[in-house]
């Protein structure tokens, strides 16, 4: 099978998916939809580009996508390169000052901008931001209550791991109503100005 055959196959596959999705697109036209894009799905540049093309299609079909992205594997890779040890408790990364700095750098300075740029290249208008911007996500420190492998609850200091306390949707509504696609990194800020790393699933 040559490259043209592969292209035709991809086109037909996309056309079939679009046909199936059309009734839902029509039903939810002009509605805000929140999509979580996990770090494990960002396997390579091609995967990110394909995801962004799908987001552009949703936007052009009348929906208002809002992207909340993760970045766990990418953060882990960067920490490893810098020789910073990573510890987890029940799937949550224990986040000290140094780790938080890397988390913010990777999420906001790397992944966030790459997703927004790829969406823009698809002809849509994306804006990259984090939950700290305009105090969008007011967070508080995670209480550290987790369950171990034996399902026994214990309390662990997770450092700067937080949970959302309040979501200020004003900036999201302003952006989506003006034809922009918000791309949000899952960081939050506390009432006293502390930055917290938040699970993207929780934010979405």
Where are these regions (language model features)?
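Nucleotide/pyrophosphate-binding catalytic subdomain
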Residues: 1-204
């Amino acid at each position: 099978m040559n490259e043209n055959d592969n292209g035709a196959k991809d086109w037909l596959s996309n056309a079939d998916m679009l046909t199936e999705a059309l009734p839902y697109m029509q039903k939810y036209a002009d509605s805000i939809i929140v999509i979580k894009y996990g770090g494990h799905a960002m396997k390579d540049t091609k995967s990110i580009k394909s995801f962004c093309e799908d987001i552009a299609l949703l936007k052009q079909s009348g929906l208002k996508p809002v992207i909340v992205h993760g970045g766990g594997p990418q953060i882990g890779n960067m920490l490893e390169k810098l020789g910073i040890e990573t510890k987890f408790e029940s799937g949550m990364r224990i986040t000290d000052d140094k780790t938080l700095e890397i988390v913010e750098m990777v999420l906001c300075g790397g992944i966030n901008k790459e997703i927004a740029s790829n969406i823009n290249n698809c002809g849509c208008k994306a804006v990259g931001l984090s939950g700290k911007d305009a105090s969008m996500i007011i967070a508080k420190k995670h209480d550290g209550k987790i369950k171990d492998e034996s399902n026994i609850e214990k309390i662990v200091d997770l450092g700067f791991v937080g949970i959302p306390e309040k979501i200020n949707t004003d900036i999201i509504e302003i952006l989506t109503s003006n034809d922009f696609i918000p791309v949000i990194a899952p960081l939050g800020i506390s009432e006293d100005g502390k930055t917290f790393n938040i699970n993207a699933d929780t934010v979405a």
